[in-house]
Amino acid sequence: MAAEASESGPALHELMREAEISLLECKVCFEKFGHRQQRRPRNLSCGHVVCLACVAALAHPRTLALECPFCRRACRGCDTSDCLPVLHLIELLGSALRQSPAAHRAAPSAPGALTCHHTFGGWGTLVNPTGLALCPKTGRVVVVHDGRRRVKIFDSGGGCAHQFGEKGDAAQDIRYPVDVTITNDCHVVVTDAGDRSIKVFDFFGQIKLVIGGQFSLPWGVETTPQNGIVVTDAEAGSLHLLDVDFAEGVLRRTERLQAHLCNPRGVAVSWLTGAIAVLEHPLALGTGVCSTRVKVFSSSMQLVGQVDTFGLSLYFPSKITASAVTFDHQGNVIVADTSGPAILCLGKPEEFPVPKPMVTHGLSHPVALTFTKENSLLVLDTASHSIKVYKVDWG
């Protein structure tokens, strides 16, 4: 019995933490719900729940009209009501939640662990974001999302510095952005699944080049150390290298690096070794279930390592569903897992795989990730419409 109790302790703590993140937090401002007036959970007429402070911020000052930030249904601030189930849950879990900070202080993060130091974005600032990139010169963060202007640029502090890329059907507009990368000379490259093209902008949002008619469904995009562009074609099952004169807005050459890939989506390039990682989404025959597979190629495009959902299940008790891939500064392959959700290190390609969890808390649905020059990890969480900045805690 004592053994069962000791085993259930971590599981119970994990359940409490998950409840606190998923149920007891306002998904607009990310503050914890509580009994204080500004933090009280309020039901909107559509059934979604936000805190009273966000209701006040969203409502028109005279008419009190507002739109639900999640489903856009119209309602009025005066028609909201306390969400009693959430308030009751706070009371039921109150003692355990009050003990949680003390428990965290008693067991601090191990030296070298990644901890979330900063979050920016949020619903309204970002809407269903899909791609993330970091400018190598300015350090600014570029995100593509489903807002009226599809490309949003943030400064290092998380403030919105600029946005462009109108939603529309014109050649220079962006219909459905999937991924984004920044070239070494600060050009913004976006894959647009809406018209199956690749669009190149300067850093101020002026269109420089539209590459259309060559891809069935362009998806992942990344910059190489030589300032080339690699792009996956999910429908054609191929990987391409584009040589572009960005200053003149001219496509010089297109080279197909790989064919016969299975629904390739995410792609990453190691600036240390030149290796290329591709994230595939093969469909299991007869099941309709989509798994994921990470393939790593050398700079000469020789396959040096691969691992799929089944292979990772030999290391972890739960299913791993990779949604994004990148390299760290040491050449390790890093993936985002939406089933966990978590961030995992798979090790170096020649040792593939040596999986190790890096981030296991505080994520909802990570879809993109990248490292800064200072070795901070940026994670794009589409469920919370935000960018989360993780740094190494040396204790």
Curated annotation (Swiss-Prot):
Signal sequence segment: none
Function of the protein: E3 ubiquitin-protein ligase. Together with the phosphatase EPM2A/laforin, appears to be involved in the clearance of toxic polyglucosan and protein aggregates via multiple pathways. In complex with EPM2A/laforin and HSP70, suppresses the cellular toxicity of misfolded proteins by promoting their degradation through the ubiquitin-proteasome system (UPS). Ubiquitinates the glycogen-targeting protein phosphatase subunits PPP1R3C/PTG and PPP1R3D in a laforin-dependent manner and targets them for proteasome-dependent degradation, thus decreasing glycogen accumulation.
GO molecular function, one term: ubiquitin protein ligase activity
Domain notes: The RING domain is essential for ubiquitin E3 ligase activity.
SMART domains in the cross-refs: RING
PROSITE patterns found in the cross-reference section: NHL (PS51125), ZF_RING_1 (PS00518), ZF_RING_2 (PS50089)
Tissues of expression: Expressed in brain, cerebellum, spinal cord, medulla, heart, liver, skeletal muscle and pancreas.
Outcome, altering S22R: In MELF2; does not significantly alters the subcellular location as compared to the wild-type
EC number: 2.3.2.27
Record annotation: effect of changing P69A: In MELF2; severely reduced interaction with EPM2A; increased levels of PPP1R3C and glycogen
Main localization category: endoplasmic reticulum
Superkingdom to which the source organism belongs: Eukaryota
InterPro entries: 6-blade_b-propeller_TolB-like, NHL_repeat, TRIM-NHL_E3_ligases, Znf_RING, Znf_RING/FYVE/PHD, Znf_RING_CS
Subcellular location: Endoplasmic reticulum; Nucleus
UniProtKB keywords: Autophagy, Disease variant, Endoplasmic reticulum, Epilepsy, Metal-binding, Neurodegeneration, Nucleus, Repeat, Transferase, Ubl conjugation pathway, Zinc, Zinc-finger
Quaternary structure (record): Interacts with AGL. Interacts (via the NHL repeats) with EPM2A/laforin. Forms a complex with EPM2A/laforin and HSP70. Interacts with PRDM8.
One example of a Gene Ontology biological process annotation: glycogen biosynthetic process
Protein name, UniProt field: E3 ubiquitin-protein ligase NHLRC1
